[in-house]
Amino acid sequence: MAQRLEAKGGKGGNQWDDGADHENVTKIHVRGGLEGIQFIKFEYVKAGQTVVGPIHGVSGKGFTQTFEINHLNGEHVVSVKGCYDNISGVIQALQFETNQRSSEVMGYDDTGTKFTLEISGNKITGFHGSADANLKSLGAYFTPPPPIKQEYQGGTGGSPWDHGIYTGIRKVYVTFSPVSISHIKVDYDKDGKVETRQDGDMLGENRVQGQPNEFVVDYPYEYITSIEVTCDKVSGNTNRVRSLSFKTSKDRTSPTYGRKSERTFVFESKGRALVGLHGRCCWAIDALGAHFGAPPIPPPPPTEKLQGSGGDGGESWDDGAFDGVRKIYVGQGENGIASVKFVYDKNNQLVLGEEHGKHTLLGYEEFELDYPSEYITAVEGYYDKVFGSESSVIVMLKFKTNKRTSPPYGMDAGVSFILGKEGHKVVGFHGKASPELYQIGVTVAPITK
């Protein structure tokens, strides 16, 4: 089932949606004008047939750029980077990245508020957004790419074997003799359970017990991205696998198991993880190939609810824990902060939190984050006992991110406080309110890549 990422960009315009029921994106048309991107149009493939989508926007004076995706060669779009003008809300520039390359920057100007549409290990199968005379916003549908099988390389001796396709790999055991790789054993993950498969011969062609060498993967936080294999003839016989080494998503490289030879093959597929092995073997590993599939999705990091700061009045509220914070609304009143509400992200979906406190005629001030690259690291503020209040109220709030600091909302007075934890980011808020904001606290999670 496709996962929908909400559209990024300015407000307004007419909503449009190409849908998600395509196998791939095959061509992208972008027309730029003086105010930014005028229109965008996509071509897709569905059930093996080309589907030409409608124009989203209006064609005026300008120029059109196109980007073709070679889907027949396994190429697919994995992410979109763009920016939009804060005043007009018009998208100014777009750049599309596939599993093989990046497009040129399409449009006039790459300044403004930047955004990214991406779900790691997934491909884009459809787009949606809004437009009027120009393109105002752009969102996308993502699906996991189908597994691919890369044919084995090496010799033709022995019999074929195939471990099949799994969720991921936890550990690899490689046994080698002085002349070749003799045995491979893999601990695979299959929906949270370990399944072990092995092929080859521990004694090898020399009939001497070999010592298995282990390479442990920190699954599901790490996965194997590529295998380097060398092959050569052994004692005038058929080609056999002489050495192996592995690279992971954490930029780790295993030791080289065996002795490297001249003929080198690298199995990899950008944006995918190694999920299975196949090849040929008898007394040794004669040939080796690979299956690549979607990378594992690690579980969310553990969260910690930090004690709030402020007074004890009002009723308790707790938004819970999310993947991150996208936007903050702060409403001020006569005595201090009258109300707050937050927009969160959960599984790449917007979640609008409830209003905490009482909305005033002054309305809300907004602080929007460049999510997911930007996140809140700390909240600073003041609380004070004010006339007519049953307890101390929050009179000022300021939000620090990994990139910048928000303006102060309210006035510095009373007791200062800082909410946060080293190496963590804010993923939720809690506190006490009604009719004013009396207390605020945060829920944090470890910062991960």
From Swiss-Prot:
<keyword id="KW-0677">Repeat</keyword>
<dbReference type="InterPro" id="IPR036404">
    <property type="entry name" value="Jacalin-like_lectin_dom_sf"/>
</dbReference>
<comment type="similarity">
    <text>Belongs to the jacalin lectin family.</text>
</comment>
<feature type="domain" description="Jacalin-type lectin 2">
    <location>
        <begin position="147"/>
        <end position="294"/>
    </location>
</feature>
<feature type="domain" description="Jacalin-type lectin 1">
    <location>
        <begin position="2"/>
        <end position="144"/>
    </location>
</feature>
<feature type="modified residue" description="N-acetylalanine">
    <location>
        <position position="2"/>
    </location>
</feature>
<protein>
    <recommendedName>
        <fullName>Jacalin-related lectin 20</fullName>
    </recommendedName>
</protein>
<feature type="region of interest" description="Disordered">
    <location>
        <begin position="294"/>
        <end position="314"/>
    </location>
</feature>
<dbReference type="Pfam" id="PF01419">
    <property type="entry name" value="Jacalin"/>
</dbReference>
<dbReference type="InterPro" id="IPR001229">
    <property type="entry name" value="Jacalin-like_lectin_dom"/>
</dbReference>
<feature type="region of interest" description="Disordered">
    <location>
        <begin position="1"/>
        <end position="20"/>
    </location>
</feature>
<dbReference type="GO" id="GO:0009506">
    <property type="term" value="C:plasmodesma"/>
</dbReference>
<feature type="domain" description="Jacalin-type lectin 3">
    <location>
        <begin position="303"/>
        <end position="446"/>
    </location>
</feature>
<dbReference type="GO" id="GO:0030246">
    <property type="term" value="F:carbohydrate binding"/>
</dbReference>
<keyword id="KW-0430">Lectin</keyword>
<dbReference type="InterPro" id="IPR033734">
    <property type="entry name" value="Jacalin-like_lectin_dom_plant"/>
</dbReference>
<keyword id="KW-0007">Acetylation</keyword>
